[in-house]
Regions:
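Amphipathic alpha-helical regulatory segments at dimerization interfaces
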Residues: 22, 38, 49, 90-101, ...
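Extended hydrophobic
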Residues: 174-255
Length: 258
């Protein structure tokens, strides 16, 4: 493990990282003045840094709203990281198979710094579908993907991730404590046991009415969940949910290993 020496500082680098971390918390972005205010810096201080980050394609300026947003460059860089690259290569064929079988979109998520990060997505072959955008982040306990990832960890690692989750929720500046308190109480040892027993979670979405999420883990060599594959299932008039669930169970998805 690399020991971090706290007696060194790099103010310009810290400024750039502060901007990137701030922009990661908003889907609509921030104006230059808002960034300066949030980071407690002057507009002049951040002007050059914003230009450099834009030139390097880490951020982009929406000329209509004059707000800065993150680009997908960080996601692209992370996808080139060998473990993530391997995970994507092994998962995508299974995801395509499931999408074809049940006519629904499928997305792949991992745990990242106290939150859930969507790193891959396969569209439904149908002419219409509900899908989750690659690069999206969510509260771990608001999603079936997050709960599955938490369930298939050691107790120590599960608690560590829940602590990091609290920090993520606070950084998001949520106005109510529903996510922080109620959802954590509902995520009981009984729920964990049921997910482990079933090797998946099938549950109505907490975010979208009419959607039932089917989430399954992908294991690493230690039998811990390294990722989760989720099908946001929309009930259709001409399809039977139980039949589609049975079809999914015939694939290699429930025994996937990275």
């Amino acid at each position: 493990m690399i020991k971090v020496k706290k007696n060194y500082s790099a103010p310009a680098l810290e400024k750039g990282l502060d901007i990137i971390e701030l922009l990661s918390k908003s889907s609509i972005g921030f104006s230059q003045a808002e960034i300066a205010k949030e980071l407690n810096r002057s507009v002049n201080e951040i002007y050059r840094m914003l230009n450099i980050l834009a030139l390097r394609n880490y951020i982009e300026l929406d000329e209509d709203t004059e707000r800065y947003k993150l680009t997908f460059k960080l996601l692209q860089l992370s996808s080139q990281h060998q473990p993530v690259k391997n995970l994507m290569q092994k998962s995508l064929p299974m995801m395509r198979e499931v999408a074809q079988l049940c006519n629904h979109s499928v997305h792949l998520s991992i745990y990242y710094a106290g939150k859930l990060l969507v790193i891959g997505q396969v569209d439904s072959p149908s002419s219409f579908n509900y899908s989750v955008k690659t690069g999206s982040t969510f509260d771990l306990l608001e999603t079936s993907s997050g709960r599955v990832l938490l369930a298939f960890q050691t107790e120590e690692e599960r608690q560590r991730r829940l602590i990091r989750r609290k920090l993520f929720i606070k950084l998001q500046k949520k106005k109510n404590n529903l996510s922080l308190n109620i959802l954590e109480k509902k995520f009981s040892s009984k729920i964990v046991h049921e997910i482990i027993k079933n090797k998946c979670e099938v549950v109505k979405s907490l975010q979208i009415d009419g959607v039932t999420n089917i989430s399954v883990p992908i294991f690493d060599h230690t039998s811990q969940a390294i990722a989760a594959v989720t099908i946001p299932f929309l009930q259709r008039i001409n399809r039977n949910f139980q039949n589609d669930l049975s079809l999914i169970k015939t694939t290699n998805l429930l025994k996937a290993q990275a």
